[in-house]
C-alpha cells in the first residue's frame, strides 16, 4: 500500500517545475486588472439591459 502512495508526488514534480518556470515571453496581467475588467463588463451589461427594457 505504501508503494502506491509515493507515485503521486513524483508524477507531479514535472508539472510543478513547468509551472514554476518564469518565461520572459509570457503576457503578464495584474489580477486587479482582470477584476476591474470583469466589473466594468458587468456594469456595461446592466446599463445595456436597462436601456433595452
UniProtKB/Swiss-Prot annotation:
Residues 51-53 are extracellular. Its main location: membrane. Keywords: Cell membrane, Membrane, Protein transport, Translocation, Transmembrane, Transmembrane helix, Transport. Pfam families: Sec61_beta. Residues 1-30 are cytoplasmic. The chain crosses the membrane at residues 31-50. InterPro entries: Preprot_translocase_SecG (IPR023531), SecG/Sec61-beta/Sbh (IPR016482). One of its GO terms (cellular component) is plasma membrane. It is found in: Cell membrane. GO terms for biological process: protein transport. It is a single-pass membrane protein. The keyword Zinc does not apply. Involved in protein export. The function of the beta subunit is unknown, but it may be involved in stabilization of the trimeric complex. Belongs to the SEC61-beta family. Component of the protein translocase complex. Heterotrimer consisting of alpha (SecY), beta (SecG) and gamma (SecE) subunits. Can form oligomers of the heterotrimer. This is Preprotein translocase subunit SecG. It comes from Haloarcula marismortui (strain ATCC 43049 / DSM 3752 / JCM 8966 / VKM B-1809).
Amino acid at each position: 500500500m505504501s508503494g502506491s502512495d509515493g507515485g503521486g508526488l513524483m508524477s507531479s514534480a514535472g508539472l510543478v517545475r513547468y509551472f514554476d518556470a518564469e518565461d520572459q515571453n509570457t503576457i503578464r496581467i495584474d489580477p486587479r486588472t482582470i477584476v476591474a475588467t470583469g466589473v466594468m463588463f458587468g456594469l456595461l451589461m446592466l446599463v445595456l439591459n436597462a436601456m433595452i427594457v
